[in-house]
């Protein structure tokens, strides 16, 4: 496998394959979870199952050959929830238009990937605020997960209240969440998918959550125009996404993908010292970011929300993966999932939504690295995190976070800590509020 430069990276074929299998087990949960979440927009579940598997194959394989890094890519958790509940359902925007917004944001990101923009972002946006955004998205998707599970529910007096714990549906969801947390806590590989499958089998046996055993496990991929991939492939509406009212949504997709990809890719690279090479390190990072943006644009065309680098790639890196062969093995494994449509369709909803909560917990753990001793960071981080679930809007939380950061720095006259990046993002945030006021 000379193409992947295994000898130069001091890797063996066996090590890379094991690393790829490890990453696959850690992230295969995305197929049932993403299709279940985005299916709330009205897109056919069968089409989404096929699209999720297909774009994971294409994006991961593209990164394998283009960047030669062990970073697998798929539909991003958090942004798929934002796409569904905040954009399509919350603002009554057609999924075709939302896909158009994803495509536009991805093209902008791809164009900027050819410049030094990403390095400018790393230098100018405080790391603490980037961590707060990650933690905020974690709160947001955990809130959505608990809501969909029925653990919390709307209350006209208190806005939110506890759900009906007499409901078998709610109790089954709590059991699944506890099972996933248990598998994760004991560091079991593939904890998420094992938790989903184990609880699904229990649901099938006891007919919980209206579940029953799938009639068959395997089938040919569904590419039909009725409820298969053909129903969502190339259905994005770019024209309607260019409407001025879509600007905040496009900016949200762009900024979140930017911070998410930079954080994930550099984090994965740090685990394996992948980008430390003074000669090729920055080139590899640049190519991986380009692959990330390309995958997202292709994802919108295929019918999925934002595609991004998966943090689960760290499991493969920790297993010894250092080259694109790891990502290629992930792509090959996902190719087999194209034939498991009946199995994924039979998984009950409350065996899936607990994954949202667990992913939210992992994302929220980033707060441990935030410097709360700095008053500007503390105030901005608080608003960034808390306003996401409170307003059902990632855009609004960005605005509160960046503006409050700038204001506290001004109040304290810490002019040396105010840079062009903060000023630009604060002006964009102010513009977002003005757009909201004019609507």
Where are these regions (language model features)?
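Helix-loop-helix hairpins and the membrane-proximal interhelical loops
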Residues: 1-47, 160-162, 196-286, 429-431
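Helix-loop-helix junctions within the multi-pass membrane cores of secondary transporters/permeases
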Residues: 1-34, 55, 75-85, 89-134, ...
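Residue-level signature of catalytic and energy-coupling elements of molecular machines
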Residues: 17, 37, 121, 190, ...
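Transmembrane helix-loop junctions in multipass membrane proteins, especially transporters and channels
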Residues: 39, 64, 68, 72, ...
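Helix-coil boundary and interhelical linker segments in multi-pass alpha-helical membrane proteins
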Residues: 36-47, 86-97, 244-247, 348, ...
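Transmembrane alpha-helix interface/packing and boundary motifs in multi-pass membrane proteins
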Residues: 59-71, 182-187, 252-260, 292-302, ...
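Membrane-embedded alpha-helical modules
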Residues: 91-205, 209, 328-439
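Loop-to-helix transition at the N-terminal end of transmembrane alpha-helices
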Residues: 41-61
């Amino acid at each position: 496998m000379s193409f992947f430069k295994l000898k130069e990276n001091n890797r063996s074929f066996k090590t890379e394959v094991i690393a790829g299998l490890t990453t696959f087990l850690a992230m295969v949960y995305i197929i049932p979870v993403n299709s279940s979440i985005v299916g709330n927009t009205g897109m056919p579940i069968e089409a989404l199952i096929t699209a999720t598997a297909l774009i994971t194959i294409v994006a991961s394989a593209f990164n394998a050959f283009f960047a030669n890094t062990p970073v697998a890519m798929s539909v991003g958790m958090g942004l798929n929830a934002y796409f569904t509940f905040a954009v399509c359902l919350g603002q009554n925007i057609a999924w075709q238009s939302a896909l158009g917004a994803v495509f536009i944001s991805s093209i902008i990101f791809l164009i900027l990937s050819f410049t030094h923009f990403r390095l400018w972002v790393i230098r100018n946006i405080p790391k603490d605020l980037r961590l707060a955004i990650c933690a905020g998205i974690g709160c947001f998707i955990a809130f959505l997960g608990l809501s969909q599970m029925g653990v919390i529910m709307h209350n006209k007096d208190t806005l939110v209240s506890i759900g009906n714990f007499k409901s078998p549906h709610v109790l089954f969801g709590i059991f699944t969440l506890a099972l996933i947390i248990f598998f994760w806590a004991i560091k079991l590989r593939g904890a998420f998918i094992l938790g989903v499958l184990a609880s699904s089998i229990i649901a099938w046996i006891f007919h919980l959550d209206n579940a029953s055993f799938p009639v068959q496990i395997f089938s040919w991929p569904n590419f039909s125009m009725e409820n298969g991939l053909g129903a969502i492939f190339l259905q994005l509406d770019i024209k309607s996404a260019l409407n001025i009212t879509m600007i905040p949504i496009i900016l949200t997709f762009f900024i979140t993908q930017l911070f998410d990809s930079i954080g994930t890719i550099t984090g994965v690279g740090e685990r394996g010292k992948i980008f430390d090479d003074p000669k090729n390190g920055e080139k590899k990072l640049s190519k991986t970011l380009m692959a990330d943006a390309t995958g997202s644009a292709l994802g919108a065309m295929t019918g999925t929300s934002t595609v991004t680098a998966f943090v689960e790639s760290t499991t493969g890196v920790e297993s010894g993966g250092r080259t694109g062969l790891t990502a290629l093995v992930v792509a090959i494994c996902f190719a087999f999932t194209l034939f498991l449509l009946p199995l994924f369709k039979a998984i009950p909803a409350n065996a899936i939504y607990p994954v949202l909560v667990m992913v939210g917990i992992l994302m929220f753990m980033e707060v441990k690295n935030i410097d709360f001793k700095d008053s500007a960071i503390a105030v901005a981080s608080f608003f960034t995190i808390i306003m996401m679930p409170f307003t059902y809007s990632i855009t609004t939380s960005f605005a509160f976070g960046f503006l409050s950061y700038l204001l506290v720095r001004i109040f304290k006259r810490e002019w040396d800590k105010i840079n062009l990046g903060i000023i630009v993002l604060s002006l964009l945030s102010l513009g977002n509020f003005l757009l909201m006021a004019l609507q």
